[in-house]
């Protein structure tokens, strides 16, 4: 079951409302006393429905969770879909100046985004659904810029999020700043991170291999449960990320 809401994000949208998709696991309305972990996701329009997806293809996450009977609530919030590429600011921890068509530079507003997720979105979900609201059952995930935000959330807000899945995280950033953030992060040993990158992404983004390896090595030096993958034939799109769900979701649900 997927419920849809429209809620405001005042610091970015003013009175404009964005869509929030909430997946409730199979049996939610039968087992009335059972509570569930929650996975918060970026780019919510791309998570469940092809009709809503930015490029016409979603992750198909609801179908996967139904088929696997995964006992997990998912709260997926829509990103800034406007032509001004405001998403790149909302999802960036650092000043971001991408190459080519994306313009820039973009002001970093990742902390504002996470403050809203923690202080507004999480209480909204916890007050309406049977969640397990503690840190140990609060997860976060995304791809591309949402993958970068997943890393940021675990590194800077490890007191709220215990587990994350970062698929093809955007790494054409100031990699030195990200590495410094990783080194400075105080992560508890029960932190779980899944991070992957597509083999084909390395072919057309010359910086990506070194940045992925460098960040993965630093993350590996932390006392956490880390799973990194190089995806054969993997690309930077939803069709490819959908195929990684059998790896990412079981990692998030490890020993739950």
Map each language-model feature to its residues.
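Non-catalytic cap/lid and distal C-terminal segments of serine-dependent acyl enzymes
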Residues: 1-256
């Amino acid at each position: 079951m997927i419920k849809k809401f429209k809620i405001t994000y005042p610091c970015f949208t003013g009175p404009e409302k964005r869509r929030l998709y909430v997946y409730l696991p199979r049996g939610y309305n039968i087992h009335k006393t059972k509570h569930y972990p929650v996975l918060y996701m970026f780019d919510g329009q791309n998570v469940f429905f092809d009709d809503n997806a930015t490029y016409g293809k979603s992750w198909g996450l609801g179908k996967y969770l139904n088929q696997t009977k995964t006992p997990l609530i998912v709260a997926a919030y829509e990103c800034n879909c406007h032509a001004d590429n405001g998403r790149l600011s909302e999802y960036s921890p650092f000043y971001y100046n991408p190459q080519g068509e994306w313009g820039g530079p973009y002001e970093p507003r990742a902390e504002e985004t996470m403050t809203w997720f923690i202080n507004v979105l999480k209480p909204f979900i916890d007050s309406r659904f049977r969640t397990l609201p503690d840190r140990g059952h609060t997860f976060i995930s995304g791809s591309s810029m949402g993958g970068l935000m997943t890393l940021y959330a675990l590194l800077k807000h490890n007191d709220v999020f215990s587990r994350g899945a970062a698929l093809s995280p955007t790494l054409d950033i100031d990699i030195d700043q990200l590495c410094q953030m990783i080194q400075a992060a105080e992560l508890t040993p029960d932190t779980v991170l899944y991070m992957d990158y597509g083999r084909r992404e390395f072919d057309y983004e010359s910086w990506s291999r070194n940045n992925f390896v460098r960040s993965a090595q630093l993350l590996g030096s932390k006392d956490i449960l880390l799973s990194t993958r190089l995806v054969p034939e993997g690309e930077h799109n939803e069709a490819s990320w959908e195929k990684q769900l059998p790896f990412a979701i079981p990692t998030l649900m490890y020993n739950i």
